[in-house]
From Swiss-Prot:
Catalyzes the reduction of the glycolytic intermediate dihydroxyacetone phosphate (DHAP) to sn-glycerol 3-phosphate (G3P), the key precursor for phospholipid synthesis. GO terms for cellular component: cytosol. Its EC number is 1.1.1.94. It catalyses: sn-glycerol 3-phosphate + NAD(+) = dihydroxyacetone phosphate + NADH + H(+); sn-glycerol 3-phosphate + NADP(+) = dihydroxyacetone phosphate + NADPH + H(+). It is an enzyme of class 1 (oxidoreductase). This is Glycerol-3-phosphate dehydrogenase [NAD(P)+]. The keyword Oxidoreductase applies. Belongs to the NAD-dependent glycerol-3-phosphate dehydrogenase family. One of its GO terms (biological process) is carbohydrate metabolic process. InterPro entries: 6-PGluconate_DH-like_C_sf (IPR008927), 6PGD_dom2 (IPR013328), G3P_DH_NAD-dep (IPR006168), G3P_DH_NAD-dep_C (IPR006109), G3P_DH_NAD-dep_N (IPR011128), NAD(P)-bd_dom_sf (IPR036291). The gene is gpsA. It is found in: Cytoplasm. Keywords: Cytoplasm, Lipid biosynthesis, Lipid metabolism, NAD, NADP, Nucleotide-binding, Oxidoreductase, Phospholipid biosynthesis, Phospholipid metabolism.
Amino acid sequence: MRIAVFGAGAWGTALALAFSARHDVVLWGRDAGHIDTLAATRHNERYLPGVPFPEELALTADFAAAARAADLHLVVTPLAGLRAAVGELNTLQPDTPLIWACKGLEAGTGKLPHEIVAEELGPAARCGVLTGPSFAAEVARAMPTAVTLAATDPAFARRWVPALHQPRLRIYANSDLVGAEIGGAIKNVLAIAAGVSDGMGFGLNARAALITRGLAEIARLAEALGGRPETLMGLAGMGDLILTCTGDLSRNRRVGLALAQGKTLAEILGELGHVAEGVSTAREVVKLAARHDVEMPLCEAVDTLLHDARLGPREVVEQLLSREPRRE
């Protein structure tokens, strides 16, 4: 089988490496110079240093050529690039099955990835999302990982879970696209909160409380949007949240750690050199929650910290801790 992976960042490269063990894979990148470097060195030193490419992995900067030769399209761009990529794929190869592996809410619209895809491809498109607790560096090194392939059409999952599943990249099927995507989006916002908490030295009790109460926020919003609570108890919810809030490979957690040190958001993003989806997602989560009358105090606190220069981490934390007690 031929798979085209669109996006030569850390996660796109990691998935291309993983799937090349069983399939013919071509990795597409927008920057032709970057792709030339990958082809010459057979490494992605910018995003995944120290991980060599197998001989079988093909590389290209020709979007159309990659799309037309594939049996499966896998879009692994930042969320901001999903709409354009899917729209172009629809023009080139409208009937090719599609999986995306980006998380968040679209800036300006607040739409989940599957809503973006439906607008570009139509509601009957054969598609799904690959999500769950997975650091690219570990997947690229074939360290054991488990993720979810969520698709509303059970036949899609039956076709692609066995095709992509591997002993060290275990893939589980789920039919709850909303729950899976809400879990993947909001965990990035909560990881910023966890980084702030740890960076301020609040300890393990505080981190456990933050993760637990954060999971409750995710579940409330997912249910309001039609998602299933049990999805949030699985890989796409609890699993992804725990990993992102506790693992120092998490870019969003590192944003929170740096905020706790007093750095400005502009300084942090400049030093990071990668996209931290939680930064843009925080504002959209708060707006989405307000539209559905869902209380999300932790996400609101992160949004305030990111976008209100008048308040620093300590002031935002004090506001949270001064909230009235209530039923769990």
